[in-house]
Structure formats: C-alpha cells, structure tokens
C-alpha cells in the first residue's frame, strides 16, 4: 500500500510538471505527444566516452605516434569526449551528432535549461572542438560540415531564458 501511494504521488507530480509546460489550447492527444517527446529527450541522456588518441593508436592511424594507416577522424586526435550527452537514440544511435544535439537543446530547454545550455557549451570545449574552430559533426566523420544550427540553438536558449525573466549574458 505504501508503494502504491508513493507511485501515485510521483505520478501526480509528473502530471503537474507536464501540465505546466503544455499549451492551454493543446488537445489531450497533443499534450500526451508533447509529454512523451519531452520524457524521451530526458531518457536519451547517456554517458559517452571516446578517446580519439587511443582509438587512432589502436588502428595504427595516429599521426602523432607515427601511425601509417588512413582512418576516419585522423585529424581529430586531440579529442577526448567523456560526458553525459543527449543522444539521438540510446539504442540505435548511441553517439552524438552536433546537428541533432543543437535541436535537442531547444526541446530540453523546456524541461532542463541548465542541461540544455551545458550541452551547447560542451561542444565548444577544447576536448571537443577542433583547433581550427570546427564543431565536431558526428562520430563517423567529425570533420563533416554542418550549417550554423549550434549558433541558432544558443540564441534560441538565450531568448527563452530572457522570456522567463532571466538574462544570462555569460551564456551567450
């Protein structure tokens, strides 16, 4: 009985949380889709570790240690990723893509603005960004080019903060 009561309380809390986020004119079906989509975004956070220097050494492709083989991402040997990252799908696509991540932060900012902004800043850290300033595209080819959706998502998150009465100049 105590277990059922606790579960009932958590369900009521979740219902209240998502009700606050749902537009008042949304139908019951639209509200459920929104709730499930946002819950899916929260569920898709994953610990991600990829040490390119080590990976390139294992494939005899590290230009720093004299590797001779050609390999994808050979120019990203500086990269060591080890963080909790929002993934497109933890099962089918368990790696990040900066393009997807930028769009994830737009939805995530509705439920966890700090995590959303941290994700945007993460891609600009020295253990992610290339020395030439390029944001990594995705694991299979970090050097692919993406349109400036990262800048768009950053501005969007800043404007969302401002609309809630907060102005984080340091974030922008």
What residues fall within each predicted segment?
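Substrate-binding groove/exosite segments of carbohydrate-active enzymes
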Residues: 22-170
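Contiguous transmembrane helix-bundle modules in multi-pass membrane proteins
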Residues: 10, 15-22
